[in-house]
UniProtKB/Swiss-Prot annotation:
It comes from the Eukaryota. It comes from Schizosaccharomyces pombe (strain 972 / ATCC 24843). This is Alpha-glucosidase. Induction: Repressed by glucose and inositol. Its EC number is 3.2.1.20. The gene is mal1. The active site is at D212, E269. Keywords: Glycosidase, Hydrolase, Maltose metabolism. The lineage of its organism: Eukaryota, Fungi, Dikarya, Ascomycota, Taphrinomycotina. GO terms for biological process: maltose catabolic process; polysaccharide catabolic process; sucrose catabolic process.
Amino acid sequence: MKVVPSEKIKPNWWRETSVYQIYPASFKDSNGDGFGDLEGIISKVDYLKALNVESIWLCPIYPSPLKDMGYDVSDYKQIDSRYGTLEDLDRLMKALHERDMKLVMDLVLNHTSDQHEWFKESRSSKTNPKRDWYFWKPARYNEKGERLPPNNWRSYFDTSAWEWDEATQEYYLHLWSVGQPDLNWETPKVREAVHDILRFWLDRGVDGFRLDAINMISKDQRFLDAPITDDRYEYQLAYQYYANGPRIHEYLNGIGNILTEYDAFSVGEMPYVLDTNEILHVVGADRRELTMIFQFDFVDLDLDPNQHKYIEGSWELSDLKKSLKKWQSALLSGGGWNASFIENHDQTRTVSRYLSDSPKYRAYSSKLMALFIIFQSGTPFVFQGQELALANIPRDWPIDEYLDVETQNFWKLFMSGNPSQEEIEKTMDIVNKRARDNGRTPMHWDSSPNGGFTKAGVKPWMRVTNDYKEWNAANQVNDPESPYTFWSKALELRKELKDAVVYGSFELISEEDPSIVAFVRESSTYKLIILLNFTGNKVSYDCPLNLTSYEILLDNYKDFICMTSPVTLNPYQAVLLKL
């Protein structure tokens, strides 16, 4: 069924833009310390402009102890010296704005670092004025008199979500690491401080924000025990109590009112939201909350039913189609807006995870994902290296090369159970497939030592993957057949055909086909068909539309023939057609 856009969807720059996500530590090191920096990003602005992306999202670059690579912020109004200075950020902003590009900052508002002055004050005494800026609770005790956390919530890093503070004899809440205490948004002064941070950056010229874990800021104040859904663990995921809590829309409206004043972009990270109506309450055109959100249906397709990433799950193409239809239909017709993504700093490389990173099909797979992401309704997000078909960490790397706190905490917990060698190998297979580290390895700029990320002889903060000599930017930017060129052309066509791609209708066709994802984007000016073979097999496809009069705009094999059905699609073939 064709889904027609709601009349509430009006032209706006953030609907028409495309966003390139930069993980600064791994993008480009300019000074030879092995750590990416703002000067390195500035040196690659023209590379990004040529890719045809129009907005740049920077992962956190604020001062931080780096317990969670910058998502533990110790000062919201400064730049970490590893990355540069406020003046360097101003120069980056100037370089982008001169090229009609935008800058989006990453704001972490659910929690701070335990080194933030707010938390230092809060933990200093029970009577400190900032004590209620965080969640502090007394201990529970079992029948043996042993001290227990206030409830059984598990952090995202597989420990208790509560940490004991010896000095004040209470626990504080941390949904992430012990170094990331959760802010208490119930306290009005916390909200005032957050609003001040937003205005600080907007007044400086920033064009918008990605808001980390933003649906965690309102929590059920009863702090009930979570149901036991995974009996392997003492502590349990409790998202029903800390995600999308009772005051979430009040808090988001406070943020949205400020963003609206500046016509600013906002995308909220909102895991555990499956109800499209709940999302429309956030991103509806008349809601004044956020402009779009990241929902996780696509990237959670292969998780087990309890959403534990290190248990092997499975997925079918029909699952992806159901999700695509659900979100495209609900938000387009309901006056909301999608953020179209499948890779980021918390996910793995899609050529490895969902398609094929074999030498034969890797480039084709990357190009397929370009059409899938870019031609949906919504604002497309490209993660650094995705345009180069970068793949996951090699399977033979030892666990010591995986530096992420999530991976290390999981492995420590797993090994504490004295697993067999067979269990270790099987679990390592899953870690290699799912670990966040996969998206965080340094960029491949050229075939020089360290892939051009940093100088020869310098040890980068994280190891560069082995295949940088074959898969790098220098090899691709001038190659008309490369993944980079294909992504660039697709992004350029999105701009040229915005009547259909940005503001047109959406229709999923051939819903029962087990191999092909096919959809139509249409306006009064254009009719586009996107055909994607998600399998490693050559497929005969019976298209319900007569393709004989269509023009081929993009084809990752350059051999598609517009003819009456059935048509043939090669393994991982992706075709964009225009009537």
